[in-house]
């Protein structure tokens, strides 16, 4: 997900997306631990998406203050 797409979301939608990505990251880590993970690049993509969302949320919080 690109930063442009994330910025178009509302704060509630961003929080929901972050929650979804965290759940996916949790599942991917389990798959990696058991040797079932085929697409290891997905781990870093999900982590980066979480970071993008957190960054944009903090930018919005600073804007409002």
Swiss-Prot record:
One of its GO terms (molecular function) is structural constituent of ribosome. SUPFAM superfamilies: Ribosomal protein L29 (L29p). GO terms for biological process: translation. Keywords: Ribonucleoprotein, Ribosomal protein. It comes from the Bacteria. InterPro entries: Ribosomal_protein_uL29, Ribosomal_uL29, Ribosomal_uL29_CS, Ribosomal_uL29_sf. Gene3D superfamilies: 1.10.287.310. One of its GO terms (cellular component) is cytosolic large ribosomal subunit. Belongs to the universal ribosomal protein uL29 family. This is Large ribosomal subunit protein uL29.
């Amino acid at each position: 997900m690109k930063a442009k797409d994330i910025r178009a979301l509302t704060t509630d939608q961003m929080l929901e997306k972050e929650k979804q990505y965290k759940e996916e990251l949790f599942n991917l880590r389990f798959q990696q631990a058991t040797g079932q993970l085929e697409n290891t690049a997905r781990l870093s993509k999900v982590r980066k998406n979480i970071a993008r969302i957190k960054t944009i949320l903090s930018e919005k919080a600073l804007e409002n203050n």
